[in-house]
Amino acid sequence: MSQKKSPRFELRSGNVDALLLALQTADMAALRDDLLARFEATPDFFSNDVIALDLRALEDDSEVALGTVIETLATLRARAIGVVARPGQREWAERFGLPLLDSQARRGSGADRATDRAAEARAAAAAEQAAADQAAREESIRAAAQATTDAAVAAAIRQTQTMLIDKPLRSGQQVYAQGDVVILDVVSYGAEVIAEGNIHIYAPLRGRALAGVKGNTGARIFSTCMEPELISIAGIYRTAEQTLPADVLGKTAQVRLADEKLILEALRLK
């Protein structure tokens, strides 16, 4: 075999930095669950780090299923590159296709402790960031819920405010009520009454009446003399071109919405 040095490669001795995962249990299913519980929420913790599996804390005859922990590490974006084992463990450890590594450090040495502290610091920082992100999400949800509640309360207050008008509405006049409106005099031709709630007219309605204008399909229009130019509830309207039923025209009646159709009914007051 030629001993001539090749210009295309060079073999050197060197050290490769790797995390050492010291296994403290032979229960690989439990170990998998612990690893996932600790690191799954922070998928960038390992960031393609290489890891050596330290088996020296296990019994020589444990013969653990290292495939489980190797697959779990791969899920967490880490790669097992070898095992550190005692002589009595090497025969079964080699079955998983990982090379046997010599560790210059002893368990409990300063180097191991420094590595452990670095790993703990990274895990703590990742957990702190995850907790901060969760707190921010919860605060956003609380703020949105509070805004929705405030809007609902404001809407309820508006709806409880009833406008009262005791003068006739002349042609060209318009009133707008954020809740219900009660009118005690005539609404003339050309006048317009608009309300987010109900419209009560204890006089002839000859102009236009639009109730539930913000989409309140439960709003109604009442009049003691129903002769409108136009009636509308939640945007569904009817004009004077459509003749009112005889029992409604000029009578005490109400208008309501059912299945997106205007229903006109005479009121028989007792």
UniProtKB/Swiss-Prot annotation:
The keyword Cell cycle applies. Keywords: Cell cycle, Cell division, Septation. InterPro entries: CAP/MinC_C, MinC, MinC_C_sf, MinC_N, Septum_form_inhib_MinC_C. GO terms for biological process: cell morphogenesis; division septum assembly; regulation of cell division; regulation of cell septum assembly. It comes from the Bacteria. Interacts with MinD and FtsZ. Belongs to the MinC family. Cell division inhibitor that blocks the formation of polar Z ring septums. Rapidly oscillates between the poles of the cell to destabilize FtsZ filaments that have formed before they mature into polar Z rings. Prevents FtsZ polymerization. This is Probable septum site-determining protein MinC.
